[in-house]
Amino acid sequence: MANVLDTLMERGYIKQFTHEAETRELLEKEKVTFYIGFDPTADSLHVGHFIAMMFMAHMQKAGHRPIALIGGGTATIGDPSGKTDMRKMMTNETIAHNVACIKKQMEKFIDFSDDKAILVNNADWLLNQNYVEFLREVGVHFSVNRMLSAECFKQRLERGLSFLEFNYMLMQGYDFYVLNKKYNCKMELGGDDQWSNMIAGVELVRKKSQESAYAMTCTLLTNSEGQKMGKTVNGALWLDPEKTSPYEFYQYWRNVNDADVEKCLKLLTFIPMDEVRRLSSLEGSQINEAKKVLAFEVTKLVHGEEEATKAQQAAEALFGKGGDMSNVPTYEMGKDKLGAELLDILVEAEIVPSKAEGKRLVKQGGLSLNGEKVADFKKTLEEADFENGEVLIKRGKKNYNKIVLA
């Protein structure tokens, strides 16, 4: 049987290891308990987290046991990795709400039945931690000089790094130590932006417990130009259908650049590699077939087959190939709003994130109403605009929404 490491490397997941040869041997010889941490900074996971869950799912399918750690404790501080400013402090109530929402989402991707996976919250051991004890037990193993050389701190030193955030590395390292002691967790997986924190955890376990510990990082989801993927005009591409509709989610993947199709098929689907290679080799207009497969498969994993089919039908209806238009994202508008400016209504309906963005679309010719380009910022929405009680809004080349009179 192939080592899961070969599968992960072939599909492009692995970026860095702490101990590659030992990791390979470990994954071949035993069922390994590993963990990935997720900070509950929002009430939904986004597509950047999805790649981490696919990483976990491949490991679980190979017989290893995942621990999904939700950082209810570390979220009270905020991870400085990749940030140029200090994150806004969240209330305990907000964190608790976000934790509950994320738990529910994770259960769609990872099998937690019969102890096949474990869900933990580091608030359980961090929030009641005695500070002096923590410094004596954990702080003694960390070198400030070494910490300051870490990439996650380097970029913050000039702009100001709070002592609060400086503790984050210790807390994340302590998470690994706790999971190692309680669940015999031997490995941490995470995004490549977490590398410094992960090394700290590996070293803490090895020093404090005299146990072997390992880490490997997953590539971040970037396009062929090196930019992070998963951003839309309305912000992040969320996994929550209330934040990003299944149709909008489907359309995002349907419209990826040709150069990004292979990478997305590898990382975000379970399609066998032979089929990935076949789809990725398509050229010209045929590459659109690969994009349709990508969009359907990713939407099916996140929202289920029924919603993926509805999104596919809506896309086909809008692009002149028949299908069911009822699945296009729809906003119900009261008749009392007739005569209001279109851009105000689009902002209220969250079709555009702001009036400024709406004006930019109009200026660039990227906003249409019932097939006609909107040229006037102050265009009002009148009853005459509604055909059979609805209007069709088009943003850019392929983003559609309906507004119906309630």
Curated annotation (Swiss-Prot):
Concerning Gene3D superfamilies, the annotation shows: HUPs, RNA-binding S4 domain, Tyrosyl-Transfer RNA Synthetase
Q: Where is the S4 RNA-binding domain?
A: 340-404
**Residues engaged in binding L-tyrosine:** Y35, Y168, Q172
This entry carries the following GO cellular component terms, namely: cytosol
> What are its GO biological-process terms?
tyrosyl-tRNA aminoacylation
Relate the protein's function as given in its record: Catalyzes the attachment of tyrosine to tRNA(Tyr) in a two-step reaction: tyrosine is first activated by ATP to form Tyr-AMP and then transferred to the acceptor end of tRNA(Tyr).
Protein's UniProt name: Tyrosine--tRNA ligase
Q: Which organism is it from?
A: Clostridium perfringens (strain 13 / Type A)
